[in-house]
UniProtKB/Swiss-Prot annotation:
Residues 24-87 bind DNA. Probable transcription factor. Residues 155-383 form the START domain. GO terms for cellular component: nucleus. It comes from Oryza sativa subsp. indica. Residues 1-24, 132-157 are annotated as: Disordered. Transmembrane segments: none annotated. This is Homeobox-leucine zipper protein HOX10.
Amino acid sequence: MAAAVAMRGSSSDGGGYDKVSGMDSGKYVRYTPEQVEALERVYADCPKPTSSRRQQLLRECPILANIEPKQIKVWFQNRRCRDKQRKESSRLQAVNRKLTAMNKLLMEENERLQKQVSQLVHENAHMRQQLQNTPLANDTSCESNVTTPQNPLRDASNPSGLLSIAEETLTEFLSKATGTAIDWVQMPGMKPGPDSVGIVAISHGCRGVAARACGLVNLEPTKVVEILKDRPSWFRDCRNLEVFTMIPAGNGGTVELVYTQLYAPTTLVPARDFWTLRYTTTMEDGSLVVCERSLSGSGGGPSAASAQQYVRAEMLPSGYLVRPCEGGGSIVHIVDHLDLEAWSVPEVLRPLYESSRVVAQKMTTAALRHIRQIAQETSGEVVYALGRQPAVLRTFSQRLSRGFNDAISGFNDDGWSIMGGDGVEDVVIACNSTKKIRSNSNAGIAFGAPGGIICAKASMLLQSVPPAVLVRFLREHRSEWADYNIDAYLASTLKTSACSLPGLRPMRFSGSQIIIPLAHTVENEEILEVVRLEGQPLTHDEALLSRDIHLLQLCTGIDEKSVGSSFQLVFAPIDDFPDETPLISSGFRVIPLDMKTDGASSGRTLDLASSLEVGSATAQASGDASADDCNLRSVLTIAFQFPYELHLQDSVAAMARQYVRSIVSAVQRVSMAISPSQTGLNAGQRIISGFPEAATLARWVCQSYHYHLGVELLSQSDGDAEQLLKMLWHYQDAILCCSFKEKPVFTFANKAGLDMLETSLVALQDLTLDRIFDEPGKEALFSNIPKLMEQGHVYLPSGVCMSGMGRHVSFDQAVAWKVLAEDSNVHCLAFCFVNWSFV
């Protein structure tokens, strides 16, 4: 670049010839390469220098001496503008490439649908002709049956036979991925678009269950194929994938014999395995294809003894078609077509094996989401806190999930064996004496005596319980079901050289849990976080020791928009974050059984305050929004793991059985509370038992606000009590009521208040007033208590408070006032937080 051009800034005299610099102030100024280089160096350090910095630049660089300060200012303005335009242009080009690729996908899908329509029209005409000429049609059908040749069985015992099967598999797979071999229908809730995971369809009326997805990812085809072939890295239900034989094929391809094991989703069904042929090849247009199908016979794979706990399932031609995209990236087509042998499971659980939607959610879209996640991490779009690398955090998620799946399935070849029970078979106790919880690098604190892991697990059917709501409640209100002493026992096994039974050193849980987010997937279907449980010492000596417990926790399907086939809360105690940290996973899994209602309930809020939708609103909610929820069935699986030493095996087993039974009872209580059939005004009145009806409380709150402040809280305060309650419930600012006692406890909150506190009406009474304010907030509140008691209300300045989940919440202003009952006595205190938001 010989010279750079910048517009000279206009001067007060309107321009003219500058005798000092010899430049025309009304025209462009040409900078020499040396001047541009000097300016670029400054721009790299400071894109927007101040006036003093520009003056300093002129003094320090003699080469810029003939340039006026205004010209320097204009140069930096233009340079920033060019930078911004370049970035915007690059962004728009990327969006355009993505839209072009998506348009290509949609055009191909439209072409496929047109072919399908033509085929259906032809079949319709043929059927009409058959109906008109029934005898002739019957004769033709018989002739067709006689003359149609059958495809001969291929010999899978030699390479040539395998290559022949591979070519057939390729043809059948492509006819499903881009053709009309299967009648595909768009999966409900999955709309294509630039920001969607892709175009997702499920089969209609074919053998087995099938799903197809296609989308755009910003990775090269070879990288995409490498990721997708590593099925255990993205398919959480995949226990193991082993390649037994690899045969080279033409065009640089390979034919592999693969044995795959899947975990059982619950303790009530056996696991599945596959013995398949996998063919990888390159097409003439440069596309990469990986297709796979089952080989006939059940004797393939490892020895029969190791496969006793599995049911052999069949994979019909499936796979991945990855095409290079202009401008970079890939267009990916994924097809999963399975026959999961639904006959082998109890009838109530067969929807898990007969639903194409389950396959789409657990396998097909999971694969597409995973490669999108990798693409965003590779491009630097994903940045996590604490300086952790995305791959490291993803590994922690995989290990948590894998440990939980191992506990549920309890495979013999992993060392698990069933222990004798106590006569009641509601909880299964399994023992693993070969499983080690400490790595070799931590051998200094290994068990002093032989031991292992005991797993207590149970499964139960739930009726009318929205899975996402249940898992969110279990996550946010651990004190409702967990025993802090058990958590302390599990955490102590990571630190000490011996395991002591809980109760020998009892601890008290403060009720406070702080959730620290670590990572989440692209669409928030998985969240990895650290949970800190705050312990309270029982003696003065223990006050000097930290009793906090840290858990690494993985949440699946808790997002409001989740439409997944599995909802999980899995956690393990941790002491540190080295890669070799042992993770003893425990937790909950809820799987919907009625797939026709997938996603219908996940949008319900955690609070039970829909009970405040009184009168006709309640009837409408029970008749419409909750109709599907009331009929929703799901299976809940609970699995908890406990390290033990050999001499304490029976004691730990008894403790584990009793603990899981107590958790089952707690979950049943919670399920009754959050069931749509239990909501309504009566449920709300039960929750705030001992207090006036919700409608009466709403009237007292509004009347007291007007009495103390002289203005109305609501725009229409002259309606009946039920109308006031509805308006207060939907009021835009957070309204909270707490008891008028020495230690105020929250007793009521409107919808905004529950959202701000990140809690539910069930657990609201677990929160005290002092827990939501930080130190400045407490000082402001306590200093105004006398004023509040004297004049009945007080304004609090803007500040920060804490939600029940430990998140900071800012607010512009808060108002506190005394709520007076009918007898003019103080019933409670009310707070209104104006313009609150999470920090």
